[in-house]
């Protein structure tokens, strides 16, 4: 598990056995072979270390390289966000992140504001829009962010990025049209599964059991009466 708080930035390089991340070890503290590590939000395993060069190699399957941005970014030798796995004694400053990318997004707009940046993104697969709502947690390229607003049922949304996050991650490298790795909040996935299981035991199929405010209130998941 991870928190979405980036600890180091490295430079990605392709390898015949996965990927190399160069220049990131200094910011990661102690690290050993077999450790889990998130690279641009993708959970990988450290397979080789190069202490002299300040880098490490991680195994990555063809599926991982093709279904995330890692394959194309390795070819471009792009900068990537790196975070070691969460210890039980660590502070949870971001939110719980599994490192299992749900899908890709496309950067629609990057707007500088007086004290922040507004980053607009759209899912490449619109079906993931159901997990997005205002104030929801979201991981973008391994960075824990909060949804500031959304439209089209969550298919497109925007994120407020503070200066510290902008300067200490790869966000400032992003351009309109870039693909980004996205992982939705684990809580949203678990809640959906629980509610759909409950609905199907009552005789409805998942497609017949929409998660509405009425349904949530009727089943004790929301306070107040939806009929008031």
Residue ranges and their predicted role:
Residues 1-228:
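Conserved loop->alpha-helix
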């Amino acid at each position: 598990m991870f928190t979405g708080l980036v600890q180091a930035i490295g430079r990605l390089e392709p390898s015949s056995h996965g990927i190399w991340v160069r220049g990131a070890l200094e910011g990661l503290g102690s690290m050993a072979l077999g450790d889990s590590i998130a690279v641009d939000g993708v959970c990988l395993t450290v397979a080789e270390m190069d202490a002299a060069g300040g880098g490490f190699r991680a195994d990555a399957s063809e599926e991982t390289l093709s279904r995330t941005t890692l394959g194309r970014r390795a070819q471009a030798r792009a900068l990537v966000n790196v975070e070691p796995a969460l210890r039980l004694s660590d502070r949870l400053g971001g939110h719980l992140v599994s490192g299992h990318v749900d899908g890709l997004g496309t950067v629609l707009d990057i707007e500088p504001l007086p004290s922040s940046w507004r980053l607009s993104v759209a899912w490449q697969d619109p079906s993931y829009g159901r997990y997005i709502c205002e104030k929801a947690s979201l991981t973008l390229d391994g960075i824990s962010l909060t949804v500031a607003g959304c439209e089209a049922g969550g298919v497109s949304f925007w994120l407020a990025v503070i200066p510290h996050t902008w300067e200490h991650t790869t966000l400032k490298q992003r351009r309109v049209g870039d693909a980004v790795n996205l992982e939705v909040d684990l809580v949203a996935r678990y809640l959906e599964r629980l509610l759909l299981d409950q609905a199907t035991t009552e005789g409805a199929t998942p497609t017949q059991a929409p998660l509405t405010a009425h349904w949530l209130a009727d089943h004790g998941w929301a306070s107040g009466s939806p009929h008031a």
